[in-house]
């Protein structure tokens, strides 16, 4: 094999290894984060909602600690309902991977009419949650809690 071919092969392998180490993040979560920022006018970073109470973040169990945590529980339940829809029950079409069309105008969120049934349902789950987050008080004491003892 020629040295130039080996260099190209090595470069491809290195780039593939680098891409494999990037953690996958469902695309819909980016949209949901943007909706949250729209609804709360950027007053609180989205990451503050990722590990809040018993339901905000991955998973969820127990009794919500406050109104904001109830918003997350309702959002989780909404995604659960989306997964039951025939339009949303095939691979990569569920709530975490299905992107949708929406608009943000001065804090007002609108799910666009061009979304199919699954996308419209998921968009409405995210829209409702983002509005709920914006209205609910944020208690710093409920961020990054020990869910094993408090939930």
From Swiss-Prot:
Note describing how the cofactor binds: Binds 1 Ca(2+) ion.
Matches recorded under InterPro entries: PLipase_A2, PLipase_A2_Asp_AS, PLipase_A2_dom, PLipase_A2_dom_sf, PLipase_A2_His_AS
Source superkingdom: Eukaryota
PROSITE patterns, alphabetized: PA2_ASP, PA2_HIS
CDD domains: PLA2c
UniProt EC number: 3.1.1.4
Sites where the protein binds Ca(2+): 55, 57, 59, 76
GO BP terms: arachidonate secretion; fatty acid biosynthetic process; lipid catabolic process; phospholipid metabolic process; positive regulation of fibroblast proliferation
Tissue specificity annotation: Expressed by the venom gland.
GO cellular component: extracellular region
Annotated signal peptide: 1-27
Subcellular location: Secreted
Family: Belongs to the phospholipase A2 family. Group I subfamily. D49 sub-subfamily.
Protein name in UniProt: Acidic phospholipase A2 2
Taxonomic lineage from the root: Eukaryota, Metazoa, Chordata, Craniata, Vertebrata
